[in-house]
Each structure stands twice: as structure tokens, then as C-alpha cells.
Amino acid sequence: MNPIVSGASVVAAGLAIGLAAIGPGIGQGTAAAQAVEGLARQPEAEGKIRGTLLLSLAFMESLTIYGLVVALCLLFANPFAG
């Protein structure tokens, strides 16, 4: 394998997982903060808020997992290797 392609693949994999984790991380923090605020305002809606929060956290985390899959593909099943 060309050393330039190998190095670029490692850098791209690092960028893929790093950038894929930033957005969901910020979103999960914001969602959790808003859920705690909502629970403080309406404690009787705890079940509905918790269910919605867990579902939205799962969707946000899936974006990070997609970034991990792209990074692993670049590292181990590199389509650019000749």
C-alpha cells in the first residue's frame, strides 16, 4: 500500500470519528439539560419525558456509531488501497 494513502486513511478515520462525535455529544448534553429542566417544571410528566429523552439519545448516538463504522472501513477495509 502506498504510504501516503495509508497515512491519509488514518487521518481521515480520526477525523471521521472525531467529527461524528462532536455533534451528537453537544446534542445529547442539550437534550439532557432540557429534560432535567422539564422534570423540574413538571415532575408528573417524568415517564413521558424520560421515554422521549431515551429515544432521542439513541438516535443521536447512532450518528456516532455510523462515524465509527466509516472509520473502521477506512482502517481495515480501505477502498483506496490498490
Swiss-Prot record:
The record marks 61 as: Reversibly protonated during proton transport. It comes from the Eukaryota. GO terms for molecular function: lipid binding; proton-transporting ATP synthase activity, rotational mechanism. Keywords: ATP synthesis, CF(0), Chloroplast, Hydrogen ion transport, Ion transport, Lipid-binding, Membrane, Plastid, Thylakoid, Transmembrane, Transmembrane helix, Transport. PROSITE patterns: ATPASE_C. It is found in: Plastid, Chloroplast thylakoid membrane. F-type ATPases have 2 components, F(1) - the catalytic core - and F(0) - the membrane proton channel. F(1) has five subunits: alpha(3), beta(3), gamma(1), delta(1), epsilon(1). F(0) has four main subunits: a(1), b(1), b'(1) and c(10-14). The alpha and beta chains form an alternating ring which encloses part of the gamma chain. F(1) is attached to F(0) by a central stalk formed by the gamma and epsilon chains, while a peripheral stalk is formed by the delta, b and b' chains. F(1)F(0) ATP synthase produces ATP from ADP in the presence of a proton or sodium gradient. F-type ATPases consist of two structural domains, F(1) containing the extramembraneous catalytic core and F(0) containing the membrane proton channel, linked together by a central stalk and a peripheral stalk. During catalysis, ATP synthesis in the catalytic domain of F(1) is coupled via a rotary mechanism of the central stalk subunits to proton translocation. In plastids the F-type ATPase is also known as CF(1)CF(0). This is ATP synthase subunit c, chloroplastic. It comes from Ochrosphaera neapolitana.
